[in-house]
Structures are given as structure tokens and as C-alpha cells.
Amino acid sequence: MNTQLEPAIAAMVADFIAAGRPKASKLSWQTRREGYLASAVLGGEREEVGAIEEWQADHYAIRLYRPKCLPCPAYPVLIYFHGGCFVSGDFETHDRQMRMLCNSAHALVFAVHTRLVPEHPYPAAHDDALAATLAIMAALPQWHGDPGRVALAGDSAGGHLALVTTLRLKAAGAALPAAQ
């Protein structure tokens, strides 16, 4: 297993250490958000996808990435919750990853942005994740999504939301994703 950091990341870590940057736990939530967004440029160029749509619901937002491959009668579906310790992260911090997932999986990728703390304490993000998942799954036919090939995923706090949402769907007796 390769335990070496990529050169750009290693340089960034060295710069942080040399500059005496404070620990994330010592930063304000606003500063953490700004830093997370600023780090998104390290992801490189954005891949072109077939189309992007975005809309706002009551307390959450959804961005749909459509693949640029030929039309499909029923696309696999990925519902993705971004990470950021529940304090930061949004569509822009994860845009490059969503584009890559969309193109490499030839899938519809629904990125979900939930409410963040501290403005919206627990269980706001959890409730948003469940509501968004139910809304997406109910509307899959309009996007040619395959209800039998739905996966919930996320990174960091988003991985937690994917897990908890799956458990809440199961407890409610609702349709479950094929993968999580």
C-alpha cells in the first residue's frame, strides 16, 4: 500500500505546518467553511458532464448530474451527501467528485446539500437527508432512474448521513437502496 501523499497535498501540509496554522478545532465555523471551499481547487479541472440541474426544497438543495453518455432507459442512481463535519461543505466543494462519479459510473448523481450546524442543530441534516432521499426516489421515473439500482453514499459526515438515512428508511418500511 502506498502511504505517500501526492506532491501537491504534501506541499500544502508542509506549508500549513511551516505557517503555524491553527488546528481546525480552534477555527470559527465560518473560517472552516471558507478554508474548505478554498481547498476545492486542489481537485484539478472539472470534467464535462451531460447536464446539471439544481433546485431548492424546503430545507435542502439538490444538484443532479446527468452523464454525457447515450440516453439510457433506466440509469443507475447515486444519492450523495457531502462531508464537512456537518459544519461545512456544499455543491462547490464536491463538484469535481460528483462529475467524476457521474461520468465513470454512467449514473445519475444527486448531490444533496443539507442544513449545516451551528445554525441548524441536530437533527436538521438527518431530516433533510431523509426527506431528499424520499423525494428523489419518488421522482426517479421522470429522470429515467432505475429504482432497483439506487445507492446512497457520502464522505465523512455525508457517509454518516448515508448510513443513518438507510437505517431510517428501513425502520419506516420504505424502499431501500440497493447499495450503501
Regions flagged by a language model, labelled:
Residues 49-51, 59, 106, 147-149, ...:
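A generic structural signal for alpha->beta connector loops
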Residues 1-67:
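A glycine/proline-hinged amphipathic helix-loop "lid/cap" segment
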Residues 134-143, 147-180:
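Primarily recognizes the serine-hydrolase "nucleophile elbow" in alpha/beta-hydrolase
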Residues 90-91, 97, 110-149:
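Catalytic nucleophile-loop/oxyanion-hole region of alpha/beta-hydrolase
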Residues 80, 87-103:
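Conserved HGGG/HGGXW glycine-rich cap/lid loop of the alpha/beta-hydrolase fold
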Residues 74-84:
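Short beta-strand element of the alpha/beta-hydrolase
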Residues 77, 106-110:
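A fold-wide structural signal in alpha/beta-hydrolase
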